[in-house]
Swiss-Prot record:
Substrate binds at R57, G58, A59, R100, Q206, N257, K258. This is Putative methylthioribose-1-phosphate isomerase. One of its GO terms (molecular function) is S-methyl-5-thioribose-1-phosphate isomerase activity. Catalyzes the interconversion of methylthioribose-1-phosphate (MTR-1-P) into methylthioribulose-1-phosphate (MTRu-1-P). It is an enzyme of class 5 (isomerase). Keywords: Amino-acid biosynthesis, Isomerase, Methionine biosynthesis. GO terms for biological process: L-methionine salvage from methylthioadenosine.
Length: 356
């Protein structure tokens, strides 16, 4: 597969997560679209809180943010001995690990650095610190390259026409470009994307606040709809394919993504519309056999009871799962950075990982 475009040809946005000179920099996604602000983080605790409160969100983005949190610890640690350094490292690791439970990239990135540290325990302290920072940067850079490949793979298999997406799996949800974001940007560049339908994505409105902002910023033709309008738009024949991100894909092809994804998958099947998820290999968890095993985060009732800081409902009990699980039977294909995986997913995902 030929890479035709570089990131700077596809988006004007900067990276959503960066690390420079002992500081983590992240676009504050809670402020968008009212204000674009890159904030600076100087402690592991501050990075962890940013992941928890969704200043940074999106599975690949929080994976990179967590990795940079460990880099930040390494560069700012005042430990005099290796034992002292390792004690602090494992505390930082646990602090970051305990932020959000569903997105597997978080654990993948943290465990990758932890494994590296344990393999180099006998090296000098300075060398261990250097390796941590270098590995965190590699994780971020690899994410951008993976997105670029997914963008090209996805553009090859999606039909020309109108695409519907849910939540935000764009540049803001990754280090740069996005998963879905890379696909629709390559399609836009090649003239095959006619219209990008955006679900508003209640209760936090990532589709309305973030996707609408970033895709219109890059000049894509977008149209925003209420979540409960999706079925009618499909019924009218105005959707040619649906593409969504994934926070965790398991061995049989079931996947967790933003709440409301499962609903779209069922509707797509009813209306005969191709339904794809797109995610890097770091989002695939082969240790789980089915989606029933994925831990689902529940968030504050306030996200449902309020909108933009204004109360919109009486003080009643709320059930607020942040994600749902889509069974693999609804999937047309899984677009990864190593190509498109087609059914049967259990066999073909296993085969994909055996070739790595």
């Amino acid at each position: 597969m030929e890479i035709k475009y570089r990131p700077e040809e596809l988006t004007k946005l900067p990276r959503s997560v960066e690390y420079r000179e002992g500081k983590v920099y992240m676009i504050n996604q809670r402020l968008l679209p009212r204000e674009f602000k890159v904030e600076e983080f100087t402690t592991v605790e501050a990075v962890a809180e940013a992941i928890k409160n969704m200043t940074v969100r999106g599975a690949p983005a929080i994976g990179a943010a967590a990795a940079f949190g460990l880099a930040l610890y390494a560069e700012t640690s005042k430990a005099k001995t290796k034992d002292e350094f390792f004690d602090g490292f494992y505390r930082a690791y646990e602090t970051l690990k305990n932020t959000r439970p569903t997105a597997v990239n978080l654990f993948w990135a943290l465990n990758r650095i932890k494994k590296l540290v344990e393999e180099h325990r006998e090296d000098s302290l300075d060398e261990i610190k250097r390796l941590i920072v270098e590995e965190a940067q590699k994780i971020a850079d690899e994410d951008v390259e993976a997105n670029l490949r997914m963008g090209h793979y996805g553009a090859e298999v999606l039909p020309e026409g109108n695409i519907l997406t849910h939540c935000n799996a764009g540049s803001l949800a990754t280090v740069h470009l996005g998963t879905v974001g890379a696909v629709v940007r390559v399609m836009h560049k090649e003239g095959t994307l006619k219209l990008l339908w955006l679900d508003e994505t209640r209760p936090v409105l990532q589709g309305a606040r973030l996707s609408a902002w970033e895709y219109s910023y890059d000049g894509l033709n977008v149209k925003l709809i209420a979540d409960n309008a999706a079925a009618f738009v499909m019924q009218q024949g105005k959707v040619d394919a649906i593409i969504v991100g994934a926070d965790r894909i398991v061995a049989n092809g079931d996947f967790a993504n933003k709440i409301g994804t499962y609903m779209l998958a069922v509707l797509a099947k009813e209306h005969g519309i191709p339904f794809f998820t797109v995610a890097p290999l770091s989002s695939i968890d082969m240790s789980l056999s089915s989606g029933k095993e994925i831990p689902i985060e529940e968030r504050s009732p306030e996200e449902v009871l309020t909108c933009g800081g204004c109360r919109i409902a009486p003080d009643v009990p709320v059930y607020n799962p942040a994600f749902d699980v889509t069974p693999h039977k609804y999937l047309t294909g899984i677009i990864t950075d190593r190509g498109v995986v087609w059914p049967p997913f259990k066999r073909n995902l296993k085969k994909l990982f055996e070739t790595l």
